């Protein structure tokens, strides 16, 4: 029975320890589950934030791409507009060039050497203007370099203008001198012809040759003057155009000076032509005056024949002079028209050059904007690539975390299953322990009741024997015989334990005396009944412990001579005392 009690106590302690361990493991697993769930929630929140950030980045990238495409389309549209404007300006230039060429073709051609000279001069001017038109496009590109030379060009142009003005004044003075000499020579020749007619008859050929040489010299001088004027005009024009292309102020000044110089040159040329014609007419009149006097003195019969060709020649010369004047007027009108057209073409060229500059600046700005947009596009693409890489890494991390969460879920499910199994095992063990305790307590109660009944019977028998022995002792004489007789009895004396744990022996006269001469061996065993913290202990075990603690009785066995005593100590824990009776 003691072994069974010990085994039951050990089983109960082991079951309680296993229950506590299982509860601790379950608590740890629950904590791990809570931590895993919290980690999973944080990861899900982080994944949602990352998904939102990725969506926002993709949206921003799409917006940036749309804006870049719009900017590129706008730039292409502006570029197309600039190209269309450029083509329109080129068409206008071609039209102006065709108009200039048509004006050249419409100019009347004549066999007159003066007109041919004028035409050549105008052709040279047109060629120079064409060259200048071609050089304008080149000068526009080299304008930055020529800005540094603008001051020097202006100074040289002013010096050349001063020199040309000086030369013109010198030529005018020489022309006036020649006119005065011509006027003086005409009346002097008249007087000589009237005074010495015979001398003129002899020297007709000489005077004609002299007049022809003089006319030739005058013609040569006029040609030289025209050449000098053209040479002076050409550098002045070129310098004026260069200065016009270099600086706007010089351009306006030279444009104002250009018509003046052209008008001055045309006036000087007209004056020289008029002077030459007057010289020729004077020479013809002198010859006409000389020839009649000579013929009247020398050959009077041929005078009407000589006067008729002279008059015809005079009329033809006068008609030719009129025609030349008309042609000059026409040429001057055409020249004015050409100058107007040239000025208009210059204005159109200036406008077109300004428009070209504006288009170039716009194109440069658009190119810069395109470069900036391309750079921003590359940066955004790089950022998108980085975000995609981060998204991939985050997706990989999320997948790994999901796998870990699944593993933890599986582990938690396994641990829950183990916990349930342990709980079931603990319940089964607790039920078995309770059943064993109830069965053991019932058997012990039965045994105790039987022992109590036997003890009561024995006590009754002892009382009977004591009564009989008292009767016999009364008959006996001495106390020693009575003691020996009582010692030899089978029951001996009942041993009772008081509350303090001291043993007392019951004598015949029912007085308690401490048993000193007996030497018992005491065996004490503490049986602690532990209670369950969560669910409590079973009612069977509590009832058995209460019954075992409340029942304090002394039983004695006749067979082995042992007595069991139940007493309660100060701590309230029931203790079992076994006393051996000799």
Swiss-Prot record:
Keyword Coiled coil found: yes
Native source species: Solanum lycopersicum (Tomato)
Keywords linked to the UniProt accession: Coiled coil
Gene: FPP
Lineage of source species: Eukaryota, Viridiplantae, Streptophyta, Embryophyta, Tracheophyta
Region feature (Disordered): 512-582
Name this protein carries in UniProt: Filament-like plant protein
Transmembrane region(s): none
Chain intervals with Low complexity compositional bias: 538-555
Assembly and binders: Interacts with MAF1.
Coiled-coil stretches noted in the UniProt entry, renumbered to this chain: 13-186, 310-477
Expression sites (tissue/organ): Expressed in seedlings, leaves, flowers, and fruits.
Gene3D superfamilies: 1.10.287.1490
Entry keyword annotation includes Coiled coil: yes
InterPro entries attached to this UniProt entry: FPP_plant
Matching PANTHER family: FILAMENT-LIKE PLANT PROTEIN 1-RELATED, FILAMENT-LIKE PLANT PROTEIN 4
Biased composition (Basic and acidic residues): 512-527
Homology family: Belongs to the FPP family.
